[in-house]
């Protein structure tokens, strides 16, 4: 069931700043080299969707604010402000400024929005806190919240997190701590640690090369575009199984695979090729697939469980459009697997950090319009914690298409919502494309349901 933007109207309360419930240290904390990988103003907003409680007596805004206040005792840097240091780097001033919290009341039921399970997710933009900065030199708050109550008793929690402070794993850890405290726990199960000094690089005279340059990057006739669409595509478990089976048939008899292909590797290659086809990239131009690789447990020694800063490197695969379009898909999947395995190694992690410390511009890929696809896998992050704080677990979670999620070259793999049982074991693919390119991409994704690639 589709919905229209006009079906949602919100009545806003005044913004409040939620502070830690106990005194916290007043200190300026430096960030790591990897923390500086995103732009300082990069905010990634997500919306958690909850059904109404069985008793209906609890006020979700009150419960969440109380739990947030307790969580900030442990995560007190998130109640501070980002500041620029004399050396140009960013730090957190732990000044107890508090977390901006906005409460809103909607004029409809969540069921009328299909619990945000439809492909049209632009409505999610209204459910996150768009805090406009008064000064262009000012940085956003590390985190902010918007809780929207619906007429049915259900609600959404829009959490906007600064990517320079937390990566996806860290943001999930923080959100889980809030939910645990809201459920009555006396403390979070995982205690946060700062330890950003573990990921500070050294100046190197041999930085990693830029994977692609502007002169050789592929271009699309559809970009730049002013009319961009955002969609969520559902890929069920059977479609993924069929895709992986077809890949194994391609390599059968030609070579021995010690390991099969994962769902991520298979779908990453397929989506990369499908997007490139939809954008009609020029044949001789190069296209880059870059995807986040979590390295917490691959450090030596591994990072502490409570580490919530950025701890990701990037797997990278570069092909010409002709190669991407004509190679067997299994060859492309193998390149994804190889790149992922390299990104896990200690040498690659160290070289990434040292290169970022020495030449951060090497990570700002100059590209022709549409040449790069940046892929992030959220399926195993735990954004929908199985913790009941009065409303059971969230039924859905979606990214809101604003700030860094407005980037045309971004794609996110998400777990299915619990609203659609038929999607158990499947994947949702969030992607943005020029409107003129979306029909072709949709056709490619539909092909997964009926035929082998």
UniProtKB/Swiss-Prot annotation:
GO terms for biological process: alkaloid biosynthetic process. Coiled coil: none annotated. Disruption phenotype: Foliar and seeds sweetness associated with the accumulation of quinolizidine alkaloids (QAs) pathway intermediates and their derivatives, but lost production of quinolizidine type antinutritional alkaloids. It comes from the Eukaryota. It is an enzyme of class 2 (transferase). The active site is at residues 163, 388. Gene3D superfamilies: Chloramphenicol acetyltransferase-like domain (3.30.559.10). Pathway: Alkaloid biosynthesis. Its EC number is 2.3.1.-. It holds the Pfam family Transferase. Tetrahydroanabasine acetyltransferase involved in the accumulation of quinolizidine type antinutritional alkaloids (QAs). QAs impart a bitter taste to plants, acting as repellents and toxicants for herbivores and predators, and possess a variety of pharmacological effects, including sedative, anticonvulsant, anti-inflammatory, antiviral, antitumor, antipyretic, anti-hepatitis B, antifibrotic, antiallergic, antidiarrheal, analgesic and antimicrobial activities. Mediates the conversion of tetrahydroanabasine into ammodendrine. Belongs to the plant acyltransferase family. Monomer. This is Tetrahydroanabasine acetyltransferase. It comes from Lupinus angustifolius (Narrow-leaved blue lupine). The lineage of its organism: Eukaryota, Viridiplantae, Streptophyta, Embryophyta, Tracheophyta.
